C-alpha cells in the first residue's frame, strides 16, 4: 500500500489515527462480511453490482455505517450521496453532499495532522475500489493519548449505474473497541 500520512479524519470521539490503515485480503468484522456477501450476491456474473440492485430494506441495519459516493470528473473526486448517522457520530461531522476534496477543510478542526492528509486518505481508498473495479477491505487504528482504543473495519466497492463502467462506490465503516 502507498504510504499515506495523517488520518482518515477525526472528531470529538475519534481524536487521531496513529498508524497507517492496513489493506486486508478478507474482511474480519461481521457487518463488513455481511455487506461484502450482499454485494457479491448482487454482482452475480457481472464485474460489479449495479446501484439499482441495492434494496435498502435488505441492509437496513447496516445503513447508519454506510457511505455512497458518486464519481465526479471520471473519478478524480467523489460527491457523497449517503453518509450514515453512525459515521457522523464517529467522525464528528455530516459529510452528505460534500466532495471528498472538501473533507480536508472540515476535518482540520478535529485533526492535529495536515488536513490535506484526510482528503488524500479518503480519495486513495475510494479511487482504489473505483479504478480497481473490485472491493477494498481495510482496518484503521484509532488512538487517543498514544493509546490504541478502537479499530475501524472498512469496505469500499465500485457500483455501476445502468452500464458496465463504475459510476459510484459503496462502503461502510464499523468500529470495534480494542481491549
Regions found by a protein language model. Give the residues of each.
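Sensory/regulatory domains in signal-transduction proteins
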Residues: 2-9, 15-38, 42-179
Amino acid at each position: 500500500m502507498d504510504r499515506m500520512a495523517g488520518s482518515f479524519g477525526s472528531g470529538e470521539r475519534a481524536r487521531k489515527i496513529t498508524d497507517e490503515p492496513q489493506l486486508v485480503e478478507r474482511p474480519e468484522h461481521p457487518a463488513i462480511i455481511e455487506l461484502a456477501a450482499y454485494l457479491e450476491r448482487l454482482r452475480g456474473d457481472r464485474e460489479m453490482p449495479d446501484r439499482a440492485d441495492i434494496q435498502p430494506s435488505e441492509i437496513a441495519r447496516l445503513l447508519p455505517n454506510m457511505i455512497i459516493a458518486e464519481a465526479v470528473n471520471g473519478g478524480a473526486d467523489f460527491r457523497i450521496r449517503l453518509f450514515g448517522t453512525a459515521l457522523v457520530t464517529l467522525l464528528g461531522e455530516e459529510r452528505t453532499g460534500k466532495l471528498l476534496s472538501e473533507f480536508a477543510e472540515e476535518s482540520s478542526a478535529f485533526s492535529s495532522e495536515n488536513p490535506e492528509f484526510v482528503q488524500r486518505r479518503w480519495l486513495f481508498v475510494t479511487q482504489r475500489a473505483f479504478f480497481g473495479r473490485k472491493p477494498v477491505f481495510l482496518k484503521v487504528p484509532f488512538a487517543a493519548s498514544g493509546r490504541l482504543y478502537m479499530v475501524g473495519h472498512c469496505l469500499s466497492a465500485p457500483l455501476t449505474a445502468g452500464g458496465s463502467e463504475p459510476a459510484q462506490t459503496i462502503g461502510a465503516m464499523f468500529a470495534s473497541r480494542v481491549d
